[in-house]
Amino acid sequence: MAKKSAENGIYSVSGDEKKGPLIVSGPDGAPSKGDGPAGLGAPSSRLAVPPRETWTRQMDFIMSCVGFAVGLGNVWRFPYLCYKNGGGVFLIPYVLIALVGGIPIFFLEISLGQFMKAGSINVWNICPLFKGLGYASMVIVFYCNTYYIMVLAWGFYYLVKSFTTTLPWATCGHTWNTPDCVEIFRHEDCANASLANLTCDQLADRRSPVIEFWENKVLRLSTGLEVPGALNWEVTLCLLACWVLVYFCVWKGVKSTGKIVYFTATFPYVVLVVLLVRGVLLPGALDGIIYYLKPDWSKLGSPQVWIDAGTQIFFSYAIGLGALTALGSYNRFNNNCYKDAIILALINSGTSFFAGFVVFSILGFMATEQGVHISKVAESGPGLAFIAYPRAVTLMPVAPLWAALFFFMLLLLGLDSQFVGVEGFITGLLDLLPASYYFRFQREISVALCCALCFVIDLSMVTDGGMYVFQLFDYYSASGTTLLWQAFWECVVVAWVYGADRFMDDIACMIGYRPCPWMKWCWSFFTPLVCMGIFIFNVVYYKPLVYNNTYVYPWWGEAMGWAFALSSMLCVPLHLLGCLLRAKGTMAERWQHLTQPIWGLHHLEYRAQDADVRGLTTLTPVSESSKVVVVESVM
């Protein structure tokens, strides 16, 4: 049993733990060996490494997870997928995949972070051979942090432009408008106009001032990826403002972040409720909601419906990015992460479903006003946020008010997802640094460098060809394919290499009881099968990226996209092969050595406290040659 001296915080080893050598990282990060207190060594007097932060209140963790996981995809992607894939029928595959895939991995990542007290890389000290999973998640979340903020920059630009008497995208006659721009939004206006051989639908879709504002003013869209053009300085300033805001949300750690999310995570719900009340009072709103929920049972047999449900679950739950692991690492060791994970998953899916009523009540009104079928106005992604909804608000009384509310909500939804993503990346990065590299203002400088690097990369997305770069990042770097690959390996490593029952015991050590066996079965069988099935389908039916159904990317652009995807997917096999080749002994000996967990000091502390109650069984060496490996994180 490990005992801790109250005077100097040094552990001693007795009982079974004396069967093998105790390996501990010293102040300089190099391992030192010992058979008791001497092996651990006294704390270095030349270092003053602060202890790892914890949330001030557990609600800080809940709100941070809500802010991170509940983002733009819940508002602009789920409602469209639900409508496209059979309305209410889509909820059947969505709920089933959430139960067998989304919730189990969501819980797995949070509990791993809480148990190991480490970010996305060092959390895999639980099975060091597969530490490539941590590097992969760092690559993915870095890509997400880089391109996701562009949506915030565009939203911020629209928000600023909303504070006018007349919305700039509501009228023609501006410098960015073409001679063909026509201000026709309502069907009766179109019917009374002289259109010279063009139908109402063609004119409204092709030459709307909303589209021209988006393409000619905001994006200044060039002819392709090979024509980057110049910087759009107005959008660049909005991008810079967003990065400065993110920096000051993250620079002081979870103590400050946990306070900010109380506003950024809750106020969007207030705006959603206000927009729903406004939307359902508009003519045609009921028709829109019916289209949203109307079941089409024939869709249930389509593989694409199940693929869309699975991809949406993994993307909206923010699985595989390492940020949930980082957030969980700041929990107290005995926090009930099982209950938290269930609550957070329900909030996430519930928000997606609720947002559908908001979106389709507005789209129903828009379709009624234009006299077209709702399929003509239903869009997903940026098309919904920056074309469909801006067009809809031009039809409402006091249009600038509703535009400002919508884009403010959009900004907040993306902001907390962005700064929590940055927090996840910074946590993993700082956990890698040995204690001897700790210096004052380490975190502040690291966050500044990360934000500055991402901003420089983002400059490629505020050029005339920037939208094509943005689509490359979105389609390849953090796609469903990469997230499914990541989730598959997470389940395999925990369930089959480390041991599902073993990890269930570890969770019991933290929360006082074993979770439902369903979680173990999912980690071991159901979730890996679901992940691999959807992954294979995505690869077999892969379609090259095409922008706006017209622009086909050049071969080198597609190669760049696959480089983004493979840069994370290859981390796992390359790290595994590298470790096995560098290790000594037979292959079985290498495997046994490299899958031996590396424990932190807090594991010994809680084993000492709870040995007579429930025990931390995974810390007990199983043979004379086994060992307990202990490291202490920098942060």
UniProtKB/Swiss-Prot annotation:
Sites where a glycan is attached: 192, 197, 548
Residues annotated as transmembrane: 61-81, 88-108, 139-159, 231-251, 270-290, 305-325, 342-362, 395-415, 445-465, 480-500, 521-541, 561-581
Taxonomy, superkingdom: Eukaryota
Record localization: Cell membrane; Apical cell membrane
Keywords linked to the UniProt accession: Cell membrane, Glycoprotein, Ion transport, Membrane, Phosphoprotein, Sodium, Sodium transport, Symport, Transmembrane, Transmembrane helix, Transport
Tissues/organs with expression: Expressed in the small intestine (at protein level). Expressed in the brain, heart, skeletal muscle and kidney. Expressed in the leukocytes.
Residue list for modification Phosphoserine: 623
GO MF term list: choline transmembrane transporter activity; creatine transmembrane transporter activity; creatine:sodium symporter activity; gamma-aminobutyric acid:sodium:chloride symporter activity
Cytoplasmic side: 1-60, 109-138, 252-269, 326-341, 416-444, 501-520, 582-635
Family: Belongs to the sodium:neurotransmitter symporter (SNF) (TC 2.A.22) family. SLC6A8 subfamily.
Name recorded for this polypeptide: Sodium- and chloride-dependent creatine transporter 1
